[in-house]
Curated annotation (Swiss-Prot):
Underlying gene: aroQ
Protein name: 3-dehydroquinate dehydratase
Source species: Shewanella oneidensis (strain ATCC 700550 / JCM 31522 / CIP 106686 / LMG 19005 / NCIMB 14063 / MR-1)
Gene3D superfamilies membership: Dehydroquinase, class II
Entry keyword Disulfide bond: no
Reactions this protein catalyses: 3-dehydroquinate = 3-dehydroshikimate + H2O
Leader sequence residues: none
Amino acid sequence: MNHKVLLINGPNLNLLGRREPSVYGHQTLADIVAQLNEQAQAAGVQLEHIQSNAEFELINAIHATDAQMIIINPAAFTHTSVALRDALLGVDIPFYEVHLSNVHAREPFRHHSYLSDKAIGVICGFGAQGYEFALTAAIKRLKSAT
C-alpha cells in the first residue's frame, strides 16, 4: 500500500523565517517542507503539502485528498474555524495538530482550539521540530495499520 500524508499549513505560515522569528523560528516553510519530504521519502511515504491564507482552499484540499493521514498547522484558524473542524470530521481522516509556539504560554485567545479535541495528538512549542514529531507519529500509525 502506498501511504500518503497531507500536510496543511494555514495563514501567515508563508512568512516563516521573517515573521516574529523569536516566536516562530528562523526556518522558512520551504526549508521545513523540504526536510519533511526527505523524512517521508526515507520511510516510503508520500507527502502532499498545501499552504494557504484562504480558509476555503484548505477546506477544498481536505475534501479532495486521498491521504490516509493529515498533519495540520491551522495557525490563526485554530481559534476561529468551525469550517476546518467540520471539513476534517467530514472526511474522517485521522490528523495531528501542530503549532510552532506553545500556544498555551501565549495570549489567552490562543488557548482554545476548535481542532484539538478531535486530533489524534497535539504537538506545540517545539518549533519546526514539531512537524518532524508529527510526521514520525503519522508514519508509525500508517505502518502499524498495514
